[in-house]
A protein has these predicted regions:
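Small, basic N-terminal interaction modules of short regulatory proteins
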Residues: 1-74
Length: 74
């Protein structure tokens, strides 16, 4: 299960794989952080800072729902 949460005041999008859990963050791009479990080393989420600035629309609610296509990695 993938959970999305948008913090409008902070302009931050949080994406969690499964239930949110303890993780460390590693910056993988401009204002994009990969969240890795401190217990298993698995990727457990993604954090996108300054989320609305990535789109022409200032109303982030128009961006949702987001279609996501997932592929199983070999």
């Amino acid at each position: 299960m993938i959970q999305l949460f948008y913090d409008k005041e902070g302009d931050v999008l949080y994406l969690s794989v499964g239930e949110p859990r303890s993780a460390i963050s590693e910056e993988i791009g401009d204002d994009v952080l990969l969240r890795v479990s401190t217990e298993s080393g698995e990727v457990v989420g993604l954090t996108v800072l300054n989320f609305s600035s990535r789109f022409d629309s200032s109303d982030v609610s128009q961006i949702f729902p987001i279609g996501i296509e997932l592929h199983k990695l070999a």
